[in-house]
Amino acid sequence: MSDHSDISTDCNSATELFSAFAENDESDVVVYAHCGGRYADIELAHDGRFEKSMEIHSSWGTFEWLIQDAFRLGYRVGIVANSDGHKGRPGASYPGAALFGAVGGLTCFLVNELARESILDCSHIH
């Protein structure tokens, strides 16, 4: 990368990211704990002010232990399931199912109107 003009804003860990959000009064953010197949210790970096939900299922698999750890630690979080294919095809199962043995997930938000603001507001409510 040739442009380093904003390098001072880079965050190299979730803890740094949450600190930056707090320092800059950034509360209108969407952050989900996400598992890429390996165990992730959410006790090391969880901030309930910003991380309102945890991704428990994706085309990478189902990671129930993530929400079990959250509940054991007393975290109050929502549950989301995503495709995680980075292709803009919500709920699509190909190629994830062939590679990882799981079909991508979908998340439901109960809102009064189908609008970005309503969905974001809903995502911040447990």
Q: Whereabouts are the PLM-identified features?
A:
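Extended, charged catalytic domains and RNA/DNA-binding interfaces, predominantly
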Residues: M1-H126
